[in-house]
């Protein structure tokens, strides 16, 4: 593959700026002059709206700033992409990060797009969910799948580790997940039940569904929060994970909920609803045993109507463990067995009243026990 040394970044067809590969294989970024006049900072802490060339200093994102790394697929999508590139005769060692952004092109998560775009397979027919799930297992367990192009088209630019596709249902954009090889056949049902419980706990989530299957208990699906339909058609929403905002390696346990609450407070300009919702998510993750609460599982979305940021709807809420037996994000320094004491300490430090923090924590603990324990 011919390496793209320069690539342009767009937001709703407006030129945001340019990425260029340095000799040190880092992607330097510079805002376009017009964007500096009437745009916004696409990454408030890392890329202020200033006329200068910004070169990444951390190595977590393979020479990219976090905001652009958010556009790239995670484990599942990267596996699909690498398999497909090999199948088409490319040496993936020669594929740069700018090449990968060009491959993402218009199809990535969020609102940022990249040009020139690398042409990807286009296929109109959608196989059944059961067939796609079986093809996912082939990819995970072997080097072969006769649906590779279709699976990449449907899920090759998605985030997360589990197999998934991105598709339209009744004109709306959805993500549908399939079990990974380490999951049981009830993985979809479990995540669906977790989503319903989370909503009962007052946590903001998009619409979720359990799609039927003949080979497992069903496939979990959720409507995408980075796509909205309005009177002008489909609208893409700019989003940033906490990992990208803080330039953190999400694979390492390097964050505490104190940081997440502070981040929410600063970024949303002290939006009380969002601060409380982040607190509720922390409580839910603790009581529902969701320990895979890393920094890419918390996202903020840009509200262009109000020129500000909001906490996104929650996602990836399900039973999970870590190899080290603790939460990836600690709670007041405690990752192994945090409880009411640690939860309220985080909430009060963020400016919430202690009585409210305590009540929310106990209410969520009770709801989780009633809805999820023993199942």
Mark where each language-model region is.
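Phosphate/dinucleotide-binding and metal-coordinating scaffold of catalytic cores
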Residues: 1-295, 299-375
């Amino acid at each position: 593959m011919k390496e793209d040394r320069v690539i342009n970044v767009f937001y709703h067809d407006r030129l945001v700026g340019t990425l260029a590969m340095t000799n040190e294989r880092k992607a330097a970024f510079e805002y376009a002059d017009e964007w500096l006049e009437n745009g916004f900072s696409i990454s408030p802490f890392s890329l202020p709206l200033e006329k200068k060339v910004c070169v990444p200093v951390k190595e977590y994102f393979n020479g990219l700033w976090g905001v652009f790394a958010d556009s790239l697929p995670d484990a599942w999508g990267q596996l699909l992409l690498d398999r497909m590139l090999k199948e088409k005769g490319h040496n993936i060692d020669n594929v740069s990060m700018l090449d990968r952004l060009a491959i993402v092109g218009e199809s990535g998560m969020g609102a940022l797009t990249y040009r020139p775009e690398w042409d990807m397979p286009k296929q109109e027919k959608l196989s059944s969910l059961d067939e796609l799930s079986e093809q996912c297992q082939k990819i995970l367990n072997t080097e072969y799948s006769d649906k590779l192009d279709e699976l990449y088209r449907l899920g090759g630019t998605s985030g997360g580790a589990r197999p998934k596709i991105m598709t339209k249902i009744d004109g709306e954009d959805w993500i549908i997940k399939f079990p990974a090889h380490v999951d049981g056949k009830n993985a979809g049902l479990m995540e669906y039940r977790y989503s319903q419980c989370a909503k009962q706990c007052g946590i903001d989530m998009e619409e979720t569904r359990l799609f039927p299957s003949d080979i497992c208990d069903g496939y979990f699906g959720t409507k995408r929060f980075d796509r909205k339909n309005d009177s002008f058609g489909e609208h893409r929403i700019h989003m940033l994970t906490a990992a990208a905002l803080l330039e953190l390696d999400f694979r390492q346990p390097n964050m505490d909920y104190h940081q997440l609450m502070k981040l929410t407070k600063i970024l949303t300009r002290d939006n009380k609803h969002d601060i409380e919702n982040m607190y509720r998510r922390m409580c839910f993750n603790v009581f529902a045993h969701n320990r895979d609460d890393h920094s890419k599982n918390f996202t903020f979305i840009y509200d262009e109507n109000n020129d500000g940021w909001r906490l996104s709807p929650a996602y990836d809420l399900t039973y999970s463990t870590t190899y080290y037996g603790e939460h990836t994000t600690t709670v007041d320094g405690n990752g192994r067995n945090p409880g009411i004491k640690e939860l309220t300490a985080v909430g009060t430090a963020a400016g919430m009243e202690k009585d409210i923090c305590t009540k929310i924590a106990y209410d969520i603990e009770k709801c989780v026990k009633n809805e999820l324990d023993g199942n």
